Swiss-Prot record:
HAMAP family: RNApol_bact_RpoZ (MF_00366). Belongs to the RNA polymerase subunit omega family. One of its GO terms (molecular function) is DNA-directed RNA polymerase activity. Signal peptide: none annotated. InterPro entries: DNA-dir_RNA_pol_omega (IPR003716), Pol_omega/Rpo6/RPB6 (IPR006110), RPB6/omega-like_sf (IPR036161). Keywords: DNA-directed RNA polymerase, Nucleotidyltransferase, Transcription, Transferase. The keyword Ribosomal protein does not apply. It comes from Polaromonas sp. (strain JS666 / ATCC BAA-500). This is DNA-directed RNA polymerase subunit omega. SUPFAM superfamilies: RPB6/omega subunit-like. GO terms for biological process: DNA-templated transcription. GO terms for cellular component: DNA-directed RNA polymerase complex. It is an enzyme of class 2 (transferase). It comes from the Bacteria.
Length: 67
């Protein structure tokens, strides 16, 4: 399986700070039981980054506040 890098994700979300926030929010959602948008057997943080790199998740994550 190919490794994910920050550079892959920065193509989708160019601001590093927004990228970290979006990935954190999404990883928290995944760890709370939300379904992943991609096939993944990785930990929630890696899955969140993979979703961002593939364009399945974007800046809309910043409009959602995880509970």
């Amino acid at each position: 399986m190919a490794r994910i890098t920050v550079e892959d994700c920065l193509e989708k979300i160019p601001n590093r700070f927004q990228l970290v926030l979006a990935a954190t929010y999404r990883a928290r959602m995944l760890s709370q039981g939300h379904a992943a948008k991609i096939e993944s057997k990785n930990k929630p943080g890696v899955t969140a980054l993979r979703e961002i790199a593939e364009g399945k998740i974007g800046l809309e994550m910043l409009k959602k506040v995880p509970s």
